[in-house]
């Protein structure tokens, strides 16, 4: 077994080999009922309370296809630029494992609902990489195993296992890429970018929340290496059920290094499934990988073929929303920002909050400033996502409005935001409770300016001598005297007027 200490460096691996990837992503569709029966798909129910003879595989139970599941699959296929089959059918994928009570999984084999598509993804530097899609097919999820005892939570070393069949039969769409070649050293980044873009697309379509941490979206990372200049693919490994964007990238990177180490030592790569470990960033062997013939696929005799009419497909196409990449490019042009700026917004999870704040009346620059500034810092400090903060886009827009009206300056606005986050009420309530209003009384400002000049005669002389930049010290003195509640720009104007100096 190759350990992390046996790995060759990533650079050395890429010096000798080209990585070839294949990504299989399973997405749980957000239907109200399961794929082939009427059982609820709601989360949080007691174990084995959302089952029936169909999803438990009882003799004589007959399935029926969930039409919403089919429609969701077509939406995904169209959004991935796939061809939609005029006729497709389900098949039985036969294997024995405790979490599959029927001893077969109802899936699609040689006749998927969608095929031959692509998805363009943007990398960190703004470069676009096209990932070709082999197919997208419908199937059902398995039950859930809970392995009790042992140190890893896996079946090996466990004293016993518990089974919950509530998940068995939940609709899935599996999206399979064609071999991803030509990414070179950026292959792990491409894998991460692809899964991220696919997740955003799924969410935009409204067919799933695609929350990886909850198992609603899972990625299998297939990887092989081949020596430079060789066309034939190497033997692949499949790292199963990777459940975060970061882990997808780390799993691909580790497997590149592991494969290279084995090949450099004259070893042979075994076609197998592997498990990814978050704590170490490494993978370990699972089981020898089956080929399609090992599953003895055959057409599902209890279900008729699915034949979506062209009219229905076009109706679905006409109702598709603006897709994420198109939307981002449009917003980037409207806002006049760079690709790197947009990528930073995406990485922070700030795009939707910013758009919602603009929709609530704020200008784009102000919305970006607050979400990417004070609110991003608060999210990082609290370990929360931006959309988990106790402030709404409407409230952020109100803060921006108060600044625009001159009732708050940036310093006071930050205090208002912190007050809202602390649960002190709406922005207006925080302003009233804390007494956070810009000092707009000219008499009060003039008095504060006179006192600052009188208390700093040396600075005043420098300003009179033409060093306008020195006015910052007097502005600071006034801001301190007014507890930050003065309009700094107006204070500077008054200082220069008092000293008879024109702005540079």
UniProtKB/Swiss-Prot annotation:
SUPFAM superfamilies from the UniProt entry: GatB/YqeY motif, Glutamine synthetase/guanido kinase
UniProt GO molecular function: asparaginyl-tRNA synthase (glutamine-hydrolyzing) activity; ATP binding; glutaminyl-tRNA synthase (glutamine-hydrolyzing) activity
Catalytic reactions on record: L-glutamyl-tRNA(Gln) + L-glutamine + ATP + H2O = L-glutaminyl-tRNA(Gln) + L-glutamate + ADP + phosphate + H(+); L-aspartyl-tRNA(Asn) + L-glutamine + ATP + H2O = L-asparaginyl-tRNA(Asn) + L-glutamate + ADP + phosphate + 2 H(+)
Q: How does it assemble?
A: Heterotrimer of A, B and C subunits.
Annotated family: Belongs to the GatB/GatE family. GatB subfamily.
Functional summary from the UniProt entry: Allows the formation of correctly charged Asn-tRNA(Asn) or Gln-tRNA(Gln) through the transamidation of misacylated Asp-tRNA(Asn) or Glu-tRNA(Gln) in organisms which lack either or both of asparaginyl-tRNA or glutaminyl-tRNA synthetases. The reaction takes place in the presence of glutamine and ATP through an activated phospho-Asp-tRNA(Asn) or phospho-Glu-tRNA(Gln).
Name by which UniProt lists this protein:
Aspartyl/glutamyl-tRNA(Asn/Gln) amidotransferase subunit B
